[in-house]
From Swiss-Prot:
It catalyses: orotidine 5'-phosphate + diphosphate = orotate + 5-phospho-alpha-D-ribose 1-diphosphate. The lineage of its organism: Archaea, Thermoproteota, Thermoprotei, Sulfolobales, Sulfolobaceae. Pathway: Pyrimidine metabolism; UMP biosynthesis via de novo pathway; UMP from orotate: step 1/2. This is Orotate phosphoribosyltransferase. InterPro entries: OPRT (IPR023031), Or_phspho_trans_dom (IPR004467), PRibTrfase_dom (IPR000836), PRTase-like (IPR029057). Its EC number is 2.4.2.10. The keyword Glycosyltransferase applies. Homodimer. Belongs to the purine/pyrimidine phosphoribosyltransferase family. PyrE subfamily.
Length: 195
């Protein structure tokens, strides 16, 4: 079973009509937060470790909540420091968004999915405010809806294990989707996915 089929089988990729954070209506939704519950996550971790080894950094920071499990596994395997960042303040306790000292450190940001790049952008700006440097971000899936271009303006390169076009191409070739689902997804890709 390829990763596209795993996503569908494990209900991490849902087909239907979903309103995204950006307000766009999408014919598919990715929810990778449950991925660590499945054995296929370890294949993803191994791919991410290989990518992370090639990216210069001093510390790994996971973006809550989706990026935290992956960043923890990468950091433990590479025996490197790790922390996490919240995009929104909790409103209680210390009210911090950044749960580590990044001053003077090169930070590798990790998240599960990138769509428009707003979450990674906010995390980058928070790290810069904390005195850290961000030149790279690593995600499992890039939805290819502008994240790489947004981050490029900040000097951040987006690395992904998979691009949504590759995943959906696999599913479109298979018999896993109904004809109307294929049409809806193809129409969405033509209008929204960066080339």
């Amino acid at each position: 079973m390829n990763f596209a089929e795993v996503l569908l089988e494990r209900k991490l990729l849902l087909i239907g009509s979903f309103v995204l954070t950006s307000g766009k209506v999408s014919p598919y939704y990715l929810d990778l937060r449950p991925l660590p519950n499945y054995p296929e996550f370890y294949d993803i971790v191994n791919q991410a470790i290989k990518k992370a080894k090639d990216i210069p950094h001093d510390i790994i920071v996971g973006i809550a909540t989706g990026g935290v499990p992956l960043s923890a596994f990468i950091a433990c395997n590479l025996k490197e420091p790790m922390g996490y960042i919240r995009i929104e303040k909790k409103g209680h306790g210390t009210n911090r968004t950044l749960e580590l000292d990044v001053k003077g450190k090169r930070v590798l940001l990790v998240d599960d999915v990138a769509t428009t790049g707003v979450s990674i952008e906010k995390a980058t700006l928070e790290i810069l405010n904390g005195g850290g440097k961000v030149s790279d971000a690593l995600v499992i899936i890039d939805r290819q809806e502008g994240a790489s271009q947004r981050l490029e303006k900040l000097g951040v390169k987006l690395h992904s294990l998979f691009k949504i076009s590759e995943i959906l191409d696999e599913l479109l070739k298979s018999d896993k989707l109904k004809d109307n689902e294929k049409k809806s997804i193809l129409d969405y890709l033509v209008k929204n996915v960066e080339k």
